[in-house]
């Protein structure tokens, strides 16, 4: 990991009526220097283009353009996120 970079946790899921549905979910542990850098890496892996919907300070929600998909990006916390299975590392 390069200087200035940290881990981010990204949850990618489907939407129904504009809200996250979680009928399927892909989870990522991403090394990046910002929330935007983390979603760029996920976009490159999934071929979705994302637009920021809102930012709460510790979590950012992105919506995929032209698809019923959203992504939640937050800083990786070992206590909260280590128990998830099948997390893709980018």
Regions found by a protein language model. Give the residues of each.
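Intrinsically disordered, low-complexity segments enriched in small/polar residues
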Residues: 2, 15-16, 30, 35, ...
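N-terminal cationic leader/targeting segments used for protein routing and processing
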Residues: 4-7, 27-30, 62-64, 78
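A short, exposed loop/beta-hairpin motif centered on an aromatic-Gly-Thr core
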Residues: 21-37
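Intrinsically disordered, low-complexity Ser/Thr/Pro-rich tracts
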Residues: 28-31, 41-43, 62, 73
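A short, charged, amphipathic alpha-helix used as a generic interaction element across diverse proteins
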Residues: 33-57
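Short, mixed-charge low-complexity intrinsically disordered segments
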Residues: 48-90
């Amino acid at each position: 990991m390069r200087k200035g970079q940290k881990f981010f946790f990204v949850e990618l899921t489907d939407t129904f009526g504009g809200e996250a549905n979680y009928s399927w979910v892909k989870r990522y542990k991403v090394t990046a220097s910002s929330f935007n850098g983390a979603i760029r890496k996920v976009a490159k892996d999934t071929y979705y283009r994302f637009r920021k919907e809102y930012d709460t300070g510790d979590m950012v929600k992105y919506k995929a353009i032209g698809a019923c998909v959203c992504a939640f990006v937050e800083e990786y916390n070992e206590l909260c996120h280590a128990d998830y299975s099948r997390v893709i590392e980018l």
